[in-house]
Amino acid sequence: LDIARRIQEGLFPKTPPQTPGYDIAGWSKPADQTGGDYYDWIALPHGRVAVMLGDVTGHGIGPALLMAICRAYTRATFPTQTELQDAMRRLNALLSEDVGEGRFITFAVAVLDPASGEVE
């Protein structure tokens, strides 16, 4: 479990995004050695940044693995989509195939445009 915890900790972002006029940070401390907590930020075209926050139901290795899958799909999906709704639909479709019955992922995303101050 200690190895799984270190791997999971390595999946969280190491440095904050460069967002002039804004400070973005994150920190997570799971109740057990591993868990399903998720936060991330991804640089998008035109200086925008997507900030994500999620939680997989449960504690332990299973939710930690689903969190890692969620992170991988998110990082693969968001930079390729120009519209937030399209990215969320694609992410939902991918995750729906992998999340077993009785499990779910709560997920929220905000897209910040530091130049205009708009949040979507």
Annotated model-derived regions:
Residues L1-E120:
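… and, occasionally, acidic/histidine-rich disordered N-termini of signaling adaptors
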